[in-house]
Swiss-Prot record:
Pathway: Amino-acid biosynthesis; L-histidine biosynthesis; L-histidine from 5-phospho-alpha-D-ribose 1-diphosphate: step 7/9. It comes from Anaeromyxobacter sp. (strain Fw109-5). It comes from the Bacteria. Its cofactor is pyridoxal 5'-phosphate. Homodimer. Belongs to the class-II pyridoxal-phosphate-dependent aminotransferase family. Histidinol-phosphate aminotransferase subfamily. GO terms for molecular function: histidinol-phosphate transaminase activity; pyridoxal phosphate binding. Keywords: Amino-acid biosynthesis, Aminotransferase, Histidine biosynthesis, Pyridoxal phosphate, Transferase. The modification N6-(pyridoxal phosphate)lysine is found at residue 224. Its EC number is 2.6.1.9. NCBIfam families: hisC. This is Histidinol-phosphate aminotransferase. Signal peptide: none annotated.
Amino acid sequence: MPLVPPHVASLTPYVPGKPIEEVEREYGVSNVAKLASNENALGPSPLALAAAREACAKVHLYPDGSAYLLRNAIAAKLGVPPEEVMVGNGSNELIELLVRTFVLDGEEVLTSAQSFVAYKLAAHEHGRTLVEAPMKGRFHYDLDALRKLLSRRTKLVFLANPDNPTGTWFTEAELTPFLDAVPKDTLVVLDEAYVEYVDAPGFQDGLALRRKYPNVVVLRTFSKIYGLAGMRLGYGLARPEVVEYVDRVRPPFNTNLVAQAAGAAALGDSAHVAKSRALVLEERPFLAKGLAALGAIVVPSQGNFVLADFPGRTGKDLFEALLREGVIARPVAGYGFPSALRITVGLRRENERCLAALGRILGA
């Protein structure tokens, strides 16, 4: 008898970005610029830090299993009823919970090839069938192709807007015909981890769409613009029936006490959010222009990162060369982009350091 089912034995574990401490140990460098994991270059809100410190005095107690205060803070911030809010140990957990809760054996999960790998992992972890539509022009969601793959077996659809790792996005005019074609008992999950960085015309977030399409679920995170990646905290918005079923399946204390306090406080610091957004809107074009000057094909992005393709080069080699320079980027060969790097938008000095290092590497 095998130790694990075939669908588990065939899994390839997710490989996160290298930690700063590991790079310092391996390469003997200091002051490493981590531009690999799309974290907030400004760090967390001071209000969130203060709330976290205060909450640390209570860590001998279990957290509120319902995350009542956090759920209500999210609801108040977004103008939705609290019963439409669910929280998770990162939005990744909510992706897994949605698959576990709603997709039966023989039903399908539909998404775009080369989009966020967590959708594929969640389907495979639970032994569910994954159906992928090819991207359009290498880097863009093809909603027409996705629509043609809809079937009576489609139970969940995952759409990242903006996408990770490409940074591309789709407009309301592109999305609405797709939503009109989706069966009402199929859930469409709009993953909006980077929505706060969007400034593109024609973009429509999922909050308004939920009013017209009750089968839409919106996922967001505290890891990006709120700067709480280490806390592992995300949330979802869905009709109450969906939230209730997810609550039945999730672990009883899936978000910790400190994270709940920090998340609620972060929501109240609109100045820090505005500052974080302004940094990205200023530095994103600076980084993109610098990469293009080095010969990269830079994919227009609405996230806090850019995807840069270096034809004739290998992303893995560039990644390792950057590590020796004290810069951590993200190779994306696993997404089907073997000559590309995904680079987080950092502080100006970090972006300049990355560009200078790449200039030396490419010119060698």
